[in-house]
Amino acid sequence: MHDDRTVVEDRLTRLLTDRLRPAVHRVVAGLDVAAWHVPGEPVPPAAALAGGDFQPFPVGGAWGPPWGTTWFRLTGTVPDLPAGSRVELVVDLGWNTASPGFQAEGLVYRPDGSVHKGLHPRNDWVPVTGRAVDLYVEAAANPTILDGFRPTRLGDRATAGEAPLYRLARADVTVRDEGLAELVHDLQVLAELRAQLPAGEPRGHEILRALSRAMDALDPADLSGTAEAARAALGPVLARPAHASAHRITAVGHAHIDSAWLWPLRETVRKVARTASNVSDLLDTHPDLVYAMSSAQQFAWLEEHRPEVFARVAEHVRAGRFVPVGGMWVESDTNMPGSEAMARQFVHGKRYFLERFGIETREAWLPDSFGYSAALPQIVALSGTRWFLTQKISWNQTNRFPHHTFWWEGIDGTRVFTHFPPADTYNGELTGAELAHAVRNFRDKGDATRSLLPFGYGDGGGGPTREMLARARRLADLEGSPRVAVEAPASFFAAAEEEYGSAAPVWVGELYLELHRATYTSQAATKQGNRRAEHLLREAELWCATASVRLGVPYPHDELDRLWKTVLLHQFHDILPGSSIAWVHREAQATYAAVAASLETLISGAVAALAGGGEHEVSFNASPFARDGVPALGAAPPPAVSGVVTVSDGVQLDNGLLRVEVDARGLVVSVLDLVAGREVLAGPGNLLQLHRDEPNRWDAWDVDPFYRSLVSDVDGVTELSVAGDTVRISRAFGASTVLQEITLAAGARRVDFRVEVDWHEQEKFLKVAFPVDVHTDRAQFETQYGHLTRPTHENTSWDAARFEVCAHRWVRVAEPGYGVALANDSTYGHDVQRVPRAGGGTASVVRLSLVRAPRFPDPATDQGRHVFRYSLVPGADVVDAVRAGYELNLPLRTVRGAAVEPLAHVVSSPPESVVVEAVKLADDGSGDVVLRVYEALGGRATATLAPSFAVAGATETDLLERDRERDALGEGLTLRLRPFQIATIRLRRS
C-alpha cells in the first residue's frame, strides 16, 4: 500500500480547522451590546450593575486600556428553535494567540449580581436558558506581557498608557451541535494518538484507515447529518482497550494561578473567581471531574470577595470533588523564607483548610517554585503532610533529574514520598503528545507503573475545559495510550506509595533548580522587606508573649495573624524571588513598610510595658544568644563599652582581637586574627565586582554561567576618611555611586561592613568578594532550621551547575581548626569559588550578591538607593556563624526601665547547639507558651528547658501545636534532639 499518511493528516487538519470546529457553534442571532468603561480601578460588581453608565457599543469596537475594566451588557432574544437545542452565547473579547490567563478575561454576571461563568480565550461560551438574554461581562484588559523578554512599560498602570488593547470581536447567540463536537474529540484523540505511535506500529495504520473512512463518510454540505456515520467509522478503533501493561496516569483537574506575576495581586483575586466559577460549572455538569486547588490565600480571597462562588466551591469540597491541596498559605518560594515563615506557610494553610472544610491536606503541592530547600522534608512532615509534588526540576538547564517517584531526604534525615509528573507540565491539556512524553520520559519504569498529570490552563488561570474532559473519557482505556483516570492527588499518592514505596530510590539534600538562580538577588527592596518583616515578627511574638505572661497584657492574636498572612502572601514564588512586574514590587515595598510600622507599634508597646519606665537604660535582646551581658530572649542594662580601637595611618584598625588594614584603594588588604595568630584574607577583601549580566532568557530570573568572565573590579576611590572606629570610602562607576563603611568595634570578634549603593546601571550585577585564606572544597550555608554543606569544586556537572546558591543569614568556610563566616542582613545570593593561593594550596573566595539590573519584566528593577550590611567573622565555628546571623538581624533595643527575665532558659549540650527560633502564645488562645527550637550544629544534642513562670505541664507538638504521638520531652523538661531536629514545645501555664 502506498504511504499516504501526510495526505490523510493534511486532509484532517483542514477539515477540523475550516469546517468542523467552526460548525460546532451555529449562529442563530446577534446580541445588542452596551459598555461602561470603568475609570480607574475595578469597582464592586453591585456598584457596576447599579450605577454603570452603559452606552451602546459596536461589535468590533475598541476597549480596554492596559489594566482597565470594561463592563459589557449583552441583551437579546433566542429565536424559536427545535426542542432540545443547546443554546450558548459565544463571546470573543478580542483574544490573541497568547495562552489563556495572559490576556483579556471576563466574568459573566446575571442582573441580580450572581456569578454565572468565566470567559477565557479557549472557554468562550456561556450557557443560556430561556428566551431572553440579559447578562453582564466584567472584562479585564490585562496586557500580554510575556511576549519574548523585551522591556515593557505595561507592567505598571502608571506607565502603561491609555490606548485600548482589544476589540470586541464577537457576541452571538449560537446553537451547539453536540454530535459535531463529539466527532471533533474522536478525530483529535485518534489523530494525536497515531502521531505518537512508532511508524511501523500496526495500530497507527489501523487508526489512519479509520480516519480516512470517517472523513469519507462526512458530507461537507451536511456535516450535522453525517456526523454519526463518521463517528461509527471510528467506533471500532476507539473501543480497543489499552494493553495490560499500559502506564497509568492520574489526571488531576487543576489551574496553576500565580498569586501575582505578570499581573497585580488585585487581578489575581478576580482570576481566582473566574476559574473557580468555571470549575464549579464543570463539576455540576461533568460527574467525572475531580479538581485540585492549592493556596489557602486564594480560597480566602474567594470567601471575602466572591462569597457566592465560595459557597459553590465549599459544596463541591464537601462532595470530595473540589480538592484543597498543598496545605500552604500560598505556593511560596522555599529557598529564601526564614525558618518560622516556612513553617507558618503550612500552619496557616493547613489550619485554614481544617477550619473551613474539616480537611487535613496530605500533599505538599509546589509545581512551580524555583528549587526546594533541604530543610523542607522535616517541615512538611511536622505539619502533618505526607507527600510532596513538584514539576519545576524538569526545567534544569544542565542535568536531568534521575527519578520521578522517590523518597526525598532532608538535612535531618526526614523523608517524604515525592513525585515529579513526567509529562513535564503543570498546565496539561491531555494531548497525545503530553501523554506519550509522560510514558517515554518516566524514569522509574519496571518498578513503578503510574504517574500524575495536572491538566487545565494555568499560570494565569483558566483551568480544565469540557474539551479536556472529553479527551480524558476517550483515553481511559484506549489501545496505544496510557490509561487515564481523573482522580484526586491523594488517590495517586496512596497507590504509588503502596506500589513503589519500599523500592523507591532516595534523593538526599536540596532539590536545586539549575535555572532561575538570579531570583536570590533580583528586587533587593522586596527581599529586604521580607527579611526585616520576618525578624520583626519574631520580636513581636516574643515580647508580646512575655508581656502577656508577666503582666497580663492582652496578646494581639488577630493582628499577628493578619501580619503573618501578609508576609506569607508576599513570599509567593514570583514576589519574593523578584520576578514580577513593577506594579507588584512597588506595592510590595509599600506593604512591607506598613507591616514594619505595625510590628514596631506592637513591639514598642510590649517593650514599654515590660520595661516599666525609669532612669536607667535597659537593652532588649530578641536573639537566642546572650549578647554583651544581655540574656537571650530577655532584657538587662547594657554593659559599659570596654576596650580600645586604635587607628593608625594607612589605615589600620586594632581592637586587640583583630587588626584590620585598609589600603589607599579602600580595600581590606589584611584582617589579622590576633587571638589565633593568623591572617584571614588571601587577597583584597570587601572588593566590589561589577559583572555584565545578559542572560539568554528570563531576565529577572536567570544569571548564566558566562557572566563570571565579564567582570571588572570597582576599586576607584573618590574619597576615603576615618571617623572613630569606622573607615568610609566613596566610589563612583557608570551612573552609580557607592559609600562603603568598615567598622571594628571595641571588643568585637567581627568586622562590620555597610554599603550604600545609589544604583543606576542596566543589565549589570554587583557582588562583594572576600578571598578567605581557608583551604576547603566545601562550604556551609544557612537554611531553615539548620544549614547544608555544598561542594565548592566543579568536579561534576551537578557541582558546576551550582555556581550561584542561596543562603540565609550566613555562609561559612572552614579547614580543620579554623573557620571564617560571612553574615548578612538582607542578601540571599552567594557564590564560593576555590582559587590558587600564593605560596601554594587554595583559598576560598566568598561573594555576596548585592544588586542586579534586569529589564524584564520590570525595566526599572532595583534602580535607586540600597543599603546592605554584612559582617566578616574570623575564627568562626558554626555556633559563631549562627550567632552572628541572629545578632546582625536582631539588633538590641535600648529603652529606659528595668531588666526582664526570659520566659524560659535553654541550656544545651554541646553548649548553644539548641537554638530557640520562636517564643509565642499558643494559637488556640489558651495562654499556653509555645517554644520552637532546633539543633543547629548537625549533631546530637540535649537541652533542658527552665521556664521562669509556673508550668502545669509540657508536651511536644507538631507545627500546628497538636500533641504528637511521640514525645521528645524527658523528665525535667529535657529534650534529646537528633541532628537538625525541630521541636515545638507547649508549656501549659498553671
Model-derived segments and spans:
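Histidine-centered catalytic/metal-binding microenvironments
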Residues: 1-42, 162-263, 534-642, 919-920, ...
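Catalytic grooves of carbohydrate-active enzymes
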Residues: 188-219, 256, 260, 414-611, ...
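Short beta-strands within extracellular/lumenal beta-sheet-rich domains
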Residues: 62-80
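C-terminal (or distal) subdomains of carbohydrate-active enzymes
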Residues: 376-382, 395, 404, 431, ...
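The substrate-binding groove and active-site-proximal loops of carbohydrate-active enzymes
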Residues: 217-224, 255-271, 294-303, 327-343, ...
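N-terminal catalytic cores of secreted or lumenal carbohydrate-active enzymes
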Residues: 2-13, 77-78, 90-336, 344, ...
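Extended extracellular/luminal ectodomain segments enriched in beta-structured repeat modules
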Residues: 79-89, 748-749, 926
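CE4/NodB-like, metal-dependent polysaccharide N-deacetylase domain
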Residues: 343-375, 382, 437-452
